[in-house]
Amino acid sequence: KIIEESLNLKDVRIFDYVEDEEGRKKPVLNKKETTIAQQKQDLIKAEFDNWIWKNPERREALTRLYNEKFNSIRMREYDGSHLTFPGMNPEIVLRPHQVNAIARILYGGNTLLAHVVGAGKTFEMVAAAQESKRLGLCSKSLFVVPNHLIEQWASDYLTLYPSANILVAYKKDFERENRKKFCARIATGDYDAVIMGHSQFEKLPMSTEHQEMFIRSQINDVINGIQMLKENEGAKFQIKAMERTRKNLQKKLETLLNTEKKDDVITFEELGIDRIFVDEAHYYKNLAAYTKMRNVAGISQTEAQKSSDMFMKCRYLDGITNGRGVIFATGTPVSNSMVELYTMQRYLQYHELERLNLTHFDAWASTFGETVTAVELAPEGTGYRAKTRFAKFHNLPELMGLFREVADIQTSDMLNLPVPKANYRTVAVEASEIQKRIVGELAERAE
């Protein structure tokens, strides 16, 4: 049983069964026996690792296979020092890391500008959009930015390129009576760029045919996951959870197909957009990952509608641009869990994950890491609990090599930006009576 759980990327758990008031058997986790079993599981994993490399022929074959798959790419270095930027404000001089990032967007494919706050991501994206249009690399760029920054983005765009022809979406433009007219302006106008908010972007529908194809592919992924769980005698609650996901997707598909088609609706495909620049892309990190793993922190099996919508549009743009139409920008690509790195890869290098057979989260996780169960302070702050996290990594050079095919990473240490020196001071403050009372109530509810 321990070996079977290990092969299925699960941490082993031991349950006792007690009868409730209605005579039904109820599983109760046996913490002591579970701890012993997990220690045995760790020993088995360690022994398997030792066994794998003992045989010279097997070691050589596996090493060759791994290197051919993951160590066969030389990282490309982008140099934008030759770029001239016609039409740019002559009073503004971009830094070397900015022109290199612009060169990456122009000459590479999908890109993640993982630059620290203050590194100049806004000007990088604006200049890349203008040069892409001038060089014929794209016909119309769409900037998707936080709602409260729309006007600031428009101002920054015209500061860098005073003569640029841009269309800015304000709140009134996406009101029901104005939306159709505004979308028609996008579709028929020859703009250098269109700027709109995150919530407005979500209101641009994909065609019914494309939505149907996308949802059916999701349903097939879930059905395959359910079949794998059944073949490996997966836990009932996991199968039930994935069945619920399948039913929700099926219901979503039925609603889509039963909705009366409106001929006057302009779809995203009809707007002529062939490149999107997404600012603060970490807002789209809640993209569901279907997995056999149980209750692992950071792995979401439910997704936000805006993330699903963004993923669908990224896949569409990949299809019409051969993987060159999506540029993300964020100072925090990974904030809470390394699962977010996998999510970014799904958005930006889905075809590469397909080539490596890593589109399914379990395949990605087993290649680059493993789950670790450790005792930690409970959220209510009054006790401890065992929590499983995707926290231990191996093959990191290969993972980062794969990630850096799309990610342009610039940290504060790498840039040495002219910022004032900060003096940090920790001040311990005594909890107030109200805070103590609220924490006490939370602890009671948790129990």
What are these regions (language model features)?
Residues 18-19, 62-65, 76-84, 116, ...:
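Short coil/turn segments at secondary-structure boundaries
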Residues 231-239:
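Charged, low-complexity interaction regions
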Residues 72-114:
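Conserved pre-motif I regulatory segment
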Residues 116-119, 124-155, 161-165, 320-325:
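Conserved SF1/SF2 helicase motif Ia
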Residues 279-280:
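Walker B catalytic acidic pair
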Residues 1-72, 162, 186, 190-194, ...:
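Charged, low-complexity intrinsically disordered regions
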Residues 179-225, 236-237, 244-275, 285, ...:
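Inter-lobe coupling linker of SF2 helicases/translocases
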Residues 148-174, 181, 185-188, 348-352:
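Conserved helix-turn-beta segment of the N-terminal RecA-like "Helicase ATP-binding" lobe
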